[in-house]
């Protein structure tokens, strides 16, 4: 048996040895490639996974990640509650007037974050120590819970994983059961009873690259007793006090469409919003999730102005796991060492250690990597950010691992990848699985192109 403090590296080395054994690599790709096609594992028409190895974590790794994530969840839960109570604090999020109107509409249940995802870099060092840097809070019904589950099921069918499991127990952490439990819980609270099941509409634009995942999720939710229709925002109608999707009555919206895009298209005049105001529909994630989804939420939790909201343990966790972050503004503040700084001149001078992110974008849009940007472009972006809200964030230590793939000739190629390990969050207090993304470029985002998703397996030597 592997002791609980054993590192994951021997298991990774064993897997890589198997990759170079006989035809295991080609035989595995011959399962993965058609399997992804058959099981809707594509993103905008591209295969979801391009490598031969999943992410491996020891039991101790996963337990440690869960404990640290839970502590940060406490911080964000307190943040969300404080922002809902205090309009003065809420101003730090730079909500638009329409967003402010939406967050004031009662949801009918008690959490602002029924589902979410914390994006992070999780490093496991050879000496057994670990480093964890959270970099973004995805609060708007985050993608990949369905993708990652089905990809894990597919990997379990591959020759490589079968040989690997001769030495190691390997269990996936499935996110869909956690998601269904969370959605059923808020629906029961909204409805006032737990006997009825949601009549759900999964709502997003028709041309989004994650459309295949909607079918994956719909199929699973149906096994949990829900009725599900997939539709666009244009296919919703609010008539006679009831919401309809493609003509079918629904009382639950699983809102995958981003709030910003909905408001850009319709303003506040949309059937979903009308139904919410009338108490005729339960929506997840709620519009209140926007408070944490804003990039400014990371500035909020790391800003000395707000430290009084958190316990000493929580403040220490923020310092340890949240890179120093500030909303771009003409102000004095404290740097990560506690020294007082004039923010804008300091940010200009510290370009090579900072990233600039728009307050409300996704898929890497508008992100400037300071150490990959010339000074003139950087300074112009800082100046623009005074009017168009953005944050600056300290450069986080990035996780790298080698992953094998087949090249065009069918030969095994080992390549270093940047690794994003993003815990899925439920009910505002529970971690249930992770999205793991790989990239060869600094801007680690599948939406931006060139990335790969792999499933996570928690392992223990037999």
Label for each model-derived stretch:
Residues 1-462:
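Preference for protein termini
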